[in-house]
């Protein structure tokens, strides 16, 4: 049996480490442009943390097979973050459930640093303590789990809404 999740690359970046926490053989697949998208940074990070992962090619394009053993051993992982912050955020999200203390080290220039800050802020509010060490190194103590959910206000994505607002100025009808 399986689940079909009709979403894009962000969902893949989030699901790979979540599935690695489980137990069993998981296949992540997609269609269209998702089959062309490399998933190498996340795959390399998970391998460094002790996860068995197989990709279609050296860039880990879909389909990807995860052999999950009931948890992620953990340790130190160095991550390329020069293209996206998604790998870092996804690793920070699952780090409190990893088997031993974990260090996430960013090897190069971190793009989208505000997204990492948001991730850490939300995790802190859920009771997860992430310590930033020298440079771009994050240390997470194992087995923290999450405390009960806190109430969050999610603000609108005004940068994306701008396209719809501009479209409404161009047509003689409502854009909703």
Q: Where on the chain are the PLM-derived regions?
A:
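Structural preference for solvent-exposed beta-strand-turn elements
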Residues: 1-176
